[in-house]
Amino acid sequence: MPRLFSYLLGVWLLLSQLPREIPGQSTNDFIKACGRELVRLWVEICGSVSWGRTALSLEEPQLETGPPAETMPSSITKDAEILKMMLEFVPNLPQELKATLSERQPSLRELQQSASKDSNLNFEEFKKIILNRQNEAEDKSLLELKNLGLDKHSRKKRLFRMTLSEKCCQVGCIRKDIARLC
């Protein structure tokens, strides 16, 4: 019997020494923060691994891309080289067919000139085109938001944030409340 008690005492001591929750990380502690402190706290909570794990896992790695003007001629060059190699290595291909294939293939210079003509828009014209498209898209999206009633929802969310910030500053708030805004 004394041996059983010594084992139970040993297990109890081991279990009591297990790491516990960090005191400042409790989700039920009241935090009173205003201004920059509140923003820092919000960034800490929303940017931490435990709260933002799903958002980080959904992100896809972005591929590095070069400028499109450089990519296009190189792809044209590769296609031309592949076609030339195919024409050389197919011995049974009649000369007439080889001639028609090479006639159909535009020269590399022609393809590069047509690509550069398309890309040599005046900077001001390019800027105007982009601004016009952005304005059209904004007008359409605002009209759709008004039709769907979503603009009221975003206002409510902003008002909720304002009241929560006032609450955190004056009374205090819980980490879970701040985490809901992430």
From Swiss-Prot:
Intracellular or extracellular location(s): Secreted
Coiled coil region boundaries: none
InterPro entries recorded: Insulin-like, Insulin-like_sf, Insulin_CS, Relaxin, Repro_Hormone_Insulin-like
Keywords noted in UniProt: Cleavage on pair of basic residues, Disulfide bond, Hormone, Pyrrolidone carboxylic acid, Secreted, Signal
Listed name of the protein: Prorelaxin
GO cellular component, one term: extracellular region
GO molecular function, one term: hormone activity
Function comment: Relaxin is an ovarian hormone that acts with estrogen to produce dilatation of the birth canal in many mammals.
Residues excised as propeptide: 57-154, 159-160
A Pfam entry, by short name: Insulin
Residues bearing the modification Pyrrolidone carboxylic acid: 25
SUPFAM superfamilies to which the protein is assigned, alphabetical: Insulin-like
UniProt xrefs under PANTHER family: PRORELAXIN H2, RELAXIN
Gene Ontology biological process terms from the UniProt entry: blastocyst growth; flagellated sperm motility; oocyte maturation; positive regulation of acrosome reaction; positive regulation of D-glucose import; positive regulation of epithelial cell proliferation
CDD domains, alphabetized: IlGF_relaxin_like (cd04365)
Family classification: Belongs to the insulin family.
